[in-house]
Structures are given as structure tokens and as C-alpha cells.
């Protein structure tokens, strides 16, 4: 009985690891450039890396070349939650368009 309980408990403990590995593999298979991302692609990124993705999307022009040598780190921290909220409402929208739209709103309020 103890062996069976140990096997069941061990299996339950491994379930989140297997699930996270599948999610990580799915994210690794997605090799689209940031300019081609949908909001769904952005939301699939780990939450701690979302500000970095916003920074890349804001810095790159349509030819995937950097436009500015300086990034507004404080602005990225401010705009990222708004982009997450906007992307949650429309997951099929173009991520770069959402970034531009939310940046415009933030800059207008400054």
C-alpha cells in the first residue's frame, strides 16, 4: 500500500514538471521575429520576460533594425501591464501595433 501511494504521489509531483517542459518546448518552437508576433505569442512569453519583448518591439522598425540607441526602461515598466491587458482582450491582434498604440497613450498622458 505504501509503495502504491508513493508511486501515485511521485507521479503527481512530476506532473507540473512535464507540463512546464511542454510549455517551454512550445515557446522554443515559436521562432517568429518579434515584429510578426500576435498578442497570443506575446502572452505565451514568461511574465518576467514580457518587458524585454516590449522593449524589442518598441526599438525595432519594420525592417527588424533598431531605431533608437536608447530605450526608455521606466516607460517599458509602465506600459507593459497596459499591453498585457490590451493583448488579453484581443489575442489575434498584431503585438507591435498594440505596443505602438499603448506607447502613444502613455506618451500623451506624460
From Swiss-Prot:
Report the induction information.
Activated by a low pH-induced dimer-to-monomer transition.
**A GO molecular-function annotation:** identical protein binding
Disulphide bond pairs: 39-87
Q: Which keywords does UniProt give here?
A: Chaperone, Disulfide bond, Periplasm, Signal
Signal peptide limits? 1-21
Which BP terms from GO are recorded? Answer: cellular stress response to acidic pH; chaperone-mediated protein folding
Principal localization? periplasm
Q: Where in the cell is it found?
A: Periplasm
* Alphabetical list of InterPro entries matching this protein: HdeA (IPR024972), HdeA/HdeB_sf (IPR038303), HdeA_sf (IPR036831), HNS-dep_expression_A/B (IPR010486)
GO cellular component terms, alphabetically, are: outer membrane-bounded periplasmic space
Q: Which domain of life is it from?
A: Bacteria
What is known about what this protein does? Required for optimal acid stress protection. Exhibits a chaperone-like activity only at pH below 3 by suppressing non-specifically the aggregation of denaturated periplasmic proteins. Important for survival of enteric bacteria in the acidic environment of the host stomach. Also promotes the solubilization at neutral pH of proteins that had aggregated in their presence at acidic pHs. May cooperate with other periplasmic chaperones such as DegP and SurA.
The similarity annotation says: Belongs to the HdeA family.
Additional free-text comment from the UniProt record: In vitro, HdeA is more efficient than HdeB at pH 2 and HdeB is more efficient than HdeA at pH 3. In vivo, both are required for optimal protection against acid stress at either pH 3 or pH 2.
- How is this protein organized at the quaternary level? Homodimer at neutral pH. Dissociates into monomer at pH 4. Changes from a highly ordered form at pH above 3.1 to a highly disordered form at pH below 2.5 that is essential for its chaperone activity.
User: What is this protein identified as?
Assistant: Acid stress chaperone HdeA
Q: What is the organism field in this record?
A: Escherichia coli (strain K12)
Amino acid at each position: 500500500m505504501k509503495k502504491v501511494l508513493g508511486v501515485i504521489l511521485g507521479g503527481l509531483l512530476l506532473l507540473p514538471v512535464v507540463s512546464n517542459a511542454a510549455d517551454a518546448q512550445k515557446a522554443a518552437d515559436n521562432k517568429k521575429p518579434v515584429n510578426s508576433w500576435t498578442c497570443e505569442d506575446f502572452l505565451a512569453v514568461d511574465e518576467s520576460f514580457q518587458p524585454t519583448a516590449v522593449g524589442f518591439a518598441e526599438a525595432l522598425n519594420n525592417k527588424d533594425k533598431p531605431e533608437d540607441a536608447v530605450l526608455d526602461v521606466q516607460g517599458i515598466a509602465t506600459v507593459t501591464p497596459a499591453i498585457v491587458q490590451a493583448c488579453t482582450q484581443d489575442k489575434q491582434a498584431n503585438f507591435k501595433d498594440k505596443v505602438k498604440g499603448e506607447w502613444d497613450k502613455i506618451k500623451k498622458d506624460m
